[in-house]
Amino acid sequence: MATGSWPTIVDVATRTDPEGNIAEVAEMLSQCNDYEGDAPYIEANEKTGHEFSFRTSIPAGSWRSYNMGVGYSKSTTGKSRVGIGMLEDWSQVDRALLRHSGQGEKFRRSEDFAFLEGMSQTIAQTLIYGNTAITPAEFMGLAPFYNSLTAAQNGANIIDCGGTGSSNTSIWYIGWSPESFFLVYPRGTTAGIHMEDRGDTVPAFDNLGNPYLAFTSVFEQHVGLCPKDWRYGARMANLDVTNAGLAGPNAYDLFAGMAETVLHFPKTTKAVSGVEKTDAPNDQFGTRRIWYCNRTV
């Protein structure tokens, strides 16, 4: 996997917390889902979202002969905005249970890690399927941006794998960089998941509404996805997992489809004899290109 020069969640957390507390949490989070080590985190220009500009056309130039002028031309740009979602959860452990466990904070941290992993999986799922039209509080994921083969310009980056049944899935190919696809966090804050230890000052409640003393950890992450340049995202859609990669007249050639998908990106990083070198020294000028698929594929 390419390393690039832009900060990931662990890098940002390390720089913003001299004590290392957030960094430790971020390191744990990066072990839960690979995307945490793939995506650059950029500070948004708003508290609740990020407005960005993108190019809609470029000058083509003019062929000219002697004594012939050249017409004026210019590029054109557009603006768009993505929202930032707020994900939060509370871990509460009965104070008496913690004392009687014989492991104290070690027992509590093992419970906290389960919450970290759960939140990480929620963000990973939202990264693909998030749709504010269905759940307004979350952020918009990849699927709504690449949901039609013909309705939008970015439909050109959707490869139809031909599946028509109920066992279809998608494979995603994303080029991460600060100029293509990146994650954003609110202006004036720090990236990644934040953990607040509230001690035993916050009461917990049983099913009958009765309070009891509990040690409480509050976890929250504010994050959004910015598809600044849609050309660096591609989707292999309608992939029937029952015959992908199998031989036979009806089988889909998975590797041929992946090769076709790679060709949709406008440019790549340093290459030798047409083969990409993901560890190339100048990789910071390109994108960190990653495949995402489920375990079945």
Locate predicted features.
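Core alpha/beta structural scaffold of self-assembling particle/tube/pore-forming proteins
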Residues: 2-37, 49-53, 63, 73-297
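Short secondary-structure boundary/capping segments within folded domains
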Residues: 40-44
